[in-house]
Amino acid sequence: MFDVIIIGAGVCGASIARRLSRYKLDILILEKENDVSMGASKANSAIVHGGYAESGKELRGRICYPGRKSFEKLNEELNFGFLANGSLVLAFDEEDMKTLDKLYQMGLENGLDDMEIIDQEKLRSIEKNVSDDAIGALYCKGAGVCSPYEYVIALVENALDNGVKLELNSEVVDIEKSNDTFKVETSKGETYESKFVINASGLNGAKVSSMITETDFDIHPRSGEYLIMQKGTGSRIKQVLFQTPSPKSKGILVTRTYHNNILIGPDAIDEEEIDLGTHEERLMEIYKLAQKSVKDDVLNLKEFIRSFTGLRPASSTGDFIIENSQTNGFINVVGIQSPGVTSSPEIARMVEGILVDLGINLTEDETYNPYRKPIIEYKELEDFNKVKDLVDLPLGNPDRLVCRCEQVSEKTIRDALNRGIELTSFDAVKRRTRAGMGFCQGAFCKNRVLEVMEDEYGHPIENRKFDSEGSGLSRINKKDINEIIKKMSK
């Protein structure tokens, strides 16, 4: 019997698990995929938002800024990668300036004290590569970027260190309640019992909710496509650059990532079905719109390395849904689209409060450890001529460079393999170490990573493909972009 079962190991489920792991509770996370952070938490803009883009009349508007204020301390404890580099919402005409004033007023209502509307002169002084057409901006000093999948991984690793249990490849197929006890059945045929159940299942939120309680909301996928440029390009931009938002999104952004790539996107398309593919027409429209924000020499399609699609779990209510359901003790945490990553610490606090109201006994665990060592130590890449001899070192040498593009050592990979979650794919290692995230996108290092995995675990790795291989996904890649460049040059 568990005290709490959490369905979903995305940013909400992970944040809640880590928050509750400080108490003497038996907690289980059930995740349907083969790793944590496999849904919206993996594929998004990676922004720690300011807290001005949503009205305080909405729950997501009220909890974004308190969530954002938690990130510096969280990163000090968990070492997942957070940089408070600031954000700029750009204005290109007087209508845009009116929009900035509305955003500023919403920010004030939400309690922000680190934003201002700046003129063209100050804008140029803090962001030299911003477009000459920008006439002003809303500047939020405390906004920033993080590595969202590393954030979720860190939360789960720390929760596991503090006694939480995790079951992967365990999709919830049925939930029943009898005599104040929930019975949760998974696709593995296992049944787990608990006093409380938290539904943090992302796009499956309405489906899971309807298994046990009356559900008056829908969750539908809203897709957004992105382009990523090679490492090092991010140094051309200091802040996160937004254009003025639409009703569906915060506008096309150009930003550096925590690991110093340029990230461009997303658009926002409501989908009938899940589609994680990327499309030439959409990506080229995103690229064209992004060029509006920066000087001509900032973006270069020849530096493109990858495209991806994120699916936001948009609710029919238009807002976050965080509440005890009509089936007492079954708590919905669904419809968590943007700014979900930023709000996640506050979401976890809210769920703790709901559990307290429902009568859970929270006793502090004196052995609780909030700290987690980093897997990746942030560093600039060395000149390859200085490190090329490390590539040829034999298997078993901790200094051997397994990935040459990102210069990932064997000791880093072995560290990632021993963090409480057995990794079963190359991509799982990639998300933790950046092996395969460089210019060649794993062409050189995939088999080398799998070799280390097999040596460390002592058994063959059955899944030897990239996550996207064999899944039917069609994504625009470097070869496709090169063909587009050729067409553009004619």
Question: PLM features: residue spans?
Answer:
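Glycine-rich phosphate/pyrophosphate-binding beta-alpha loops
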Residues: 53, 143-145, 249, 330-343, ...
